Each structure stands twice: as C-alpha cells, then as structure tokens.
C-alpha cells in the first residue's frame, strides 16, 4: 500500500481516528481494513474508536483508545502516561454509554443487529448521495458533482 510505504519511509507515526466505522461501507470489518493492514505491517500506532456516531451514544464519551506497540517497556511507559491523562481529563467518565457499548459488543444477537443497522445507515448515505447528485445535475447546477457519488461516508469534499 502506497500510504503505508510513505509513512514508513518518512518515519511518521500513524494515528487512526475511527469515529464513523461501519458508515463507509456498511461493514465494520471492511471499514477497519487500513488499521489491520498497518498492524500486520508491523507499525506502532494509535487507534481511537468512538461509539458516539455508530452506536448513537452522543455525549456519552464511549469509545476506545488503542496503542499498538512491540515492546513491554513501551507498553509500560504508554500505560503510565495514559493513566495520568485519563485521570486529569476524565476522572469520572459517564458510565451509561460505556455500559450500552459493552452490552452491544458482547452480546452476539445485539452485535448482529447493530451490524444490520450500520448496513442500513450506510445504504441510506449512499442513496442520499445519489439523490443529491441527481438533483444537482437535474437543476443544471454549475460545477462537477461526480465526487459526491464516487466518495464514501458521511462527508463530501
């Protein structure tokens, strides 16, 4: 993968923000492909996952932070720093959202239902992109609008 090669060549540190996992393709596994690729390629990296959007837990601060490393020493140092940051930033995070996320992630039937809901939402996003594109073309709106249907996810540039 070209991006991974450049990141390695320039000695950059990858940080993935997975705030909308499942919305791009409708599949959690597919949307996490790049993260798995970098991990399998041996990169140390950070991954932030939020359940605010894809589980509808807005304002609940439900999510995960992962630091992928290869040494026990680095793991110990990172854990120490994360504990300090967590204490100063959110010493008492809301528990409700974390409980909901944990319940969904650990119950096979609820997890499958969540995956089905993500597929539905992703399909709706694709449908809305198509409708927006068609309306812009129908109205003769100046500009090229092909990017709206070529891109994926909730946002369009």
Please provide the spans of the model-predicted regions.
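Active-site pre-lysine segment of PLP-dependent enzymes
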Residues: 1-13, 18-57, 64
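Alpha-helical scaffold segments in soluble metabolic enzymes
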Residues: 2, 37, 100-103, 131
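Generic recognition of flexible, low-complexity loop/linker segments
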Residues: 2-3, 51-52, 88-89, 142-144
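Hydrophobic alpha-helical segments and helix-packing faces
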Residues: 31, 94-97, 125
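Amphipathic alpha-helical segments in well-structured domains
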Residues: 31-35, 79, 129
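Conserved core segment of the aminotransferase class I/II
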Residues: 40-115
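Conserved PLP-binding catalytic core of the aspartate aminotransferase-like
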Residues: 113-157
């Amino acid at each position: 993968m070209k991006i991974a090669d450049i990141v390695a060549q320039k000695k950059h540190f990858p940080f993935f923000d997975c705030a909308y996992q499942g919305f791009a393709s409708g599949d959690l596994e597919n949307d996490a492909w790049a993260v798995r690729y970098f991990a399998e390629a041996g990169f140390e990296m950070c991954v932030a996952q939020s359940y605010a959007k894809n589980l509808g837990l807005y304002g609940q601060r439900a999510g995960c932070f992962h630091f992928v490393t290869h040494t026990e020493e680095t793991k110990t140092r990172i854990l120490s720093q994360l504990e300090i940051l967590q204490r100063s930033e959110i010493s008492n995070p809301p528990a409700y959202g974390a409980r909901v996320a944990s319940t969904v992630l650990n119950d096979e039937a609820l997890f499958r239902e969540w995956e089905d809901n993500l597929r539905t939402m992703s399909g709706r996003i694709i449908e809305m992109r198509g409708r927006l594109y068609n309306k812009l073309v129908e109205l003769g709106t100046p500009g090229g609008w092909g990017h709206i249907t070529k891109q994926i996810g909730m946002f369009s540039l």
